[in-house]
Amino acid sequence: MILRLLPPLLLLGAVGCSRDTFFQPDARVAYPAPLPPGADSARVTAGRHYKHGPLNTLLLGPHYRQTWSQPVTLPVFKPATVVAGGLKFEKLGGGFQTTSMTLVDPSGRSYALRSIDKDPYKTLPKVLRQGFILGTVRDATSAGMPYGAFVVPPLAEAAGVLHTTPRPYYVRLDEQGLGHASERLQGDVVMLEDKFSNKNDRVDALREAEEFEESDVVLSERYKNQKNRLDESAYLRARLLDLWIGDWDRHEGQWDWAAFAQPDGTRLWRPIPKDRDQVFFRFDDGLLSWVVSRIVPKFRTFGPHYQSIEGYTRNARFIDERALASMTKEAYLRTAKDLQQRLTDDVIKQAVRQGLPKEVYQREGARMEANLRARRAQLPKAAQEFYRLQAHQVVVPGSDQEERFVVERLNDTATVVSVYGQAKGGKDSQGAPLLYQRRFNPRDTHTVVLHGLQGEDEFIVSGSVAKSPFIDIYGGPDEDIVRDSSHVGGLRKKTRFFDTARNNELIGGKETKDRTEHSVVSHAFDRDGSGR
């Protein structure tokens, strides 16, 4: 990615800022005059260092520079009184661009405190961590709306999406109440946000949750056994909300999950979006930044139209693939239309008015509201395009327990994939639970990828048709069996088996392509985004 961006970055760097001291020394407008000890509020700017002259603004883009440099009044962060009983420092966060830390109250409830401004220094190769390039990449932070995250909670609430409720503060330049980490946020504009990491963190909507985990843990649990499932309907709803507000940075690390016990003994994990740093993004409004946006489609401006659904969803490709596998076109359109009904003009107006500081609302409020209304009208069309991208290749994983994958090529417009779990009476008994089922149309879906993972799995493919998606079968490390009696018109074989050459049984037909090999890499599956 950095290599692709290097030519336009060099262009941008030619006009970018190369100051060694890039960031404002204190967010307060009155700096260096000291803030009175008992002050409850302060007049601050989120980042007046992003304000540039006419030439730089023409080339790099106006972005949200005026909003970053707009003086606003924010409450002073007081660790001892910000919540009942006060907050104490627990640990530093691991973010590369923002400074973050975990704080806890006396009941054990945890919060995240993090800077609104970013420093991408650590994300760059060492050779680029200086001069024009560093200054330009730092300057790109001004494309983010610094107060956008505070607009989202009422919108998410109306949409039926679980959410955190961040609040903005100013940290005194002489604040010492955060222990040895105090100096990391002194003089900064920050947000305080709920964390969902233990049972003490429950809010009303999560009162019945058994457990909270991050995506890597949840995915590991999902693939370990058949008792853990992802709430794909809730995830789809959250992702369409992401599209509507232009949040393109929704990778797997941007989600918490809450586990809810189900009557059948399974656990349903519901998503909780977090870290709304990139909502209402405004980037391709300069001559050179426009060039960059054509190279990297996710860097588009939040406006009345959805400029690139592929760009908006690229960062979330991994988690989307794993959390939307059963969602049909009808589900996408039904959810989009439901959101249209929920996200009324009044909801939009109240969210924007309450979320933005009044000085920022006067500048940006009307434009943001108009864009949200226009995008709401186009949401079903955006959802249909999102479906098209997700439906092209669908990954259907099993678990580390035994499963039976049944593929029925019914006709030229319908191939049904069903996954069955273990029956109570044993492998060959009746009544095996249905874990997954979806009907695929080859006009929408090119390939369905089946992963057995661990356990001795069985794959059965049948039916004679003229058209069908490719069925790619990856058995896993244990002994698996594939039975393929299907036939699809044309010269290409549409059932492909990928696994190790030994310890598997392949009963294939004319439609089967044997892609087995000696390496265990042949059936590798990335469970949690680590690449392992």
Language model feature labels by segment:
Residues 77-213, 267-268, 272-314, 439-441:
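Conserved ATP-binding subdomain of kinase catalytic cores across diverse folds
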